[in-house]
From Swiss-Prot:
Segments of the chain annotated as binding DNA: 171-223
Entry-linked SUPFAM superfamilies: EF-hand (SSF47473)
Quaternary structure and interacting proteins, as annotated: Interacts (via GBA motif) with guanine nucleotide-binding protein G(i) alpha subunit GNAI3. Preferentially interacts with inactive rather than active GNAI3. Interaction with GNAI3 is inhibited when NUCB2 binds calcium, probably due to a conformational change which renders the GBA motif inaccessible. Binds to the postmitotic growth suppressor NDN; coexpression abolishes NUCB2 secretion. Interacts with MC4R.
Family: Belongs to the nucleobindin family.
Domain EF-hand: 241-276, 293-328
Binds to necdin: annotated segments: 213-420
Keywords in alphabetical order: Calcium, Cleavage on pair of basic residues, Cytoplasm, DNA-binding, Endoplasmic reticulum, Golgi apparatus, Guanine-nucleotide releasing factor, Membrane, Metal-binding, Nucleus, Phosphoprotein, Repeat, Secreted, Signal
Organism field: Mus musculus (Mouse)
Signal peptide: 1-24
Positions of region (Disordered): 193-225, 365-420
Record's protein name: Nucleobindin-2
PROSITE patterns: EF_HAND_1, EF_HAND_2
Domain notes: The GBA (G-alpha binding and activating) motif mediates binding to the alpha subunits of guanine nucleotide-binding proteins (G proteins).
Protein residues bound to Ca(2+) 1: 254, 256, 258, 265
Length: 420
């Protein structure tokens, strides 16, 4: 659809952070101790350490973004205010698919790193013998008051921060998805306003037809139910459905063999269900909606299985869930196309916010244009004064020459012509 605005929302909050690295003061080098001063072609200049626990992640994001020529050009031309305000992040819509894919991968890796911290806390309580200090060494710089040792207080502080970040990450994704859907509808309606009555009816008819095509899909099993897991067992794992065994299933899908099903491993179980509804080759299927559906499925299963709310599923929790009635006889699962994602009042409120923002931008643009015109007038006035001054000086010099007086220099000193 021409009004579709594809956004990678979770990346929007990252680009403003580049300000820290961009504004950093370069390190002075004692050139007396540098033996080879010849320039090295294509030498790589490492950005300074920001001191943030996501420093490495930040550097990797910047490196990936700078591989995109369009974004690199925008970054070079952007001023500090554009970076701070987040306006530069809107350019993410225009980066290549390859760059977006790499950014997605970096984001997943960073979220996984935070999850490792939570697993370390659980392992510490169970005393499994894991080297926690080695695992958490990368996070020790967070505690500026105690940089030498890692105490229990440091671990608790990081656990709370990681948990809060992950929870906020999910909430933000839901909020941004809702805004995305409202923006799509807003753009669609605005586009219809530009059409004739006949063309508008054609577009409305196409829109309804695409909705019907999207809603026409096989039944989606309830996430985490026996039917859903057995389908994965049979179709993905290639095993006999009559031999389905929850314990074996758990071990098969504990990909990293750490004794837990983390959020990523859980989300992988829903791929077949999502493929029933979404196909990237179909214009009527929105892949951003698919990821929202995946998130909803994961949150739902976690709410039913993850008893201690540590965002990890143990084998014990998993087996206990398979003994519940809901595992065998679950309620039907409602996909996004069966739900009202926003009300008409919410859309109107969102559109009013957009209108306010557009008016503010328009006013700002008018102010900047006025400032530009004022500066141009001042420049023209100064140029005119400068021209008048030069003309007056030339006139005075000519008059002095006519009177036989030696011309003077800029400071009033006399200038004598050499005799020939």
């Amino acid at each position: 659809m021409r009004w579709r605005i594809i956004q990678v929302q979770y990346c929007f909050l990252l680009v403003p952070c580049m300000l820290t690295a961009l504004e950093a003061v370069p390190i002075d080098v004692d050139k007396t101790k540098v033996h080879n001063t010849e320039p090295v072609e294509n030498a790589r200049i490492e950005p300074p350490d920001t001191g943030l626990y996501y420093d490495e992640y930040l550097k990797q994001v910047i490196e990936v973004l700078e591989t995109d020529p369009h974004f690199r050009e925008k970054l070079q031309k952007a001023d500090i205010e554009e970076i701070r305000s987040g306006r530069l992040s809107q350019e993410l819509d225009l980066v290549s698919h390859k760059v977006r894919t790499r950014l997605d991968e970096l984001k997943r890796q960073e979220v996984g790193r935070l999850r490792m911290l939570i697993k370390a806390k659980l392992d510490a309580l169970q005393d499994t013998g894991m080297n926690h200090h080695l695992l958490l060494k990368q996070f020790e710089h967070l505690n500026h008051q105690n940089p030498n040792t890692f105490e229990s207080r440091d671990l608790d502080m990081l656990i709370k921060a990681a948990t809060a970040d992950l929870e906020q990450y999910d909430r933000t994704r839901h909020e941004e998805f809702k805004k995305y859907e409202m923006m799509k509808e807003h753009e669609r309606r605005e586009y219809l306003k530009t059409l004739s009555e006949e063309k508008r009816k054609e577009e409305e008819s196409k829109f309804e037809e695409m909705k019907r095509k999207h809603e026409d899909h096989p039944k989606v099993n309830h996430p985490g139910s026996k039917d859903q897991l057995k389908e994965v067992w049979e179709e993905t794992d290639g095993l006999d459905p009559n031999d389905f065994d929850p314990k074996t299933f758990f071990k098969l899908h504990d990909v990293n063999n750490d004794g837990f099903l983390d959020e990523q491993e859980l989300e992988a179980l829903f791929t077949r269900e999502l493929e029933k509804v979404y196909n990237p080759q179909n214009a009527e299927d929105d892949m951003i909606e698919m990821e929202e559906e995946r998130l909803r499925m994961r949150e739902h299963v976690m709410s039913e299985i993850d008893n201690n709310k540590d965002r990890l599923v143990t084998l014990e929790e998993f087996l206990r869930a398979t003994e519940k009635k809901e595992f065998l006889e679950p309620d039907s699962w409602e996909t996004l196309d069966q739900q009202q994602l926003f009300t008409e009042d919410e859309l109107k409120e969102y559109e009013s916010i957009i209108a306010i923002q557009e008016n503010e931008l328009k006013k700002r643009a008018e102010e900047l244009q006025k400032q530009k015109e004022d500066l141009q007038r001042q420049h023209d006035h100064l140029e005119a004064q400068k021209q008048e001054y030069h003309q007056a000086v030339q006139h005075l010099e000519q008059k002095k020459l006519q009177q036989g007086i030696a011309p003077s220099g800029p400071a009033g000193e006399l200038k004598f012509e050499p005799h020939t």
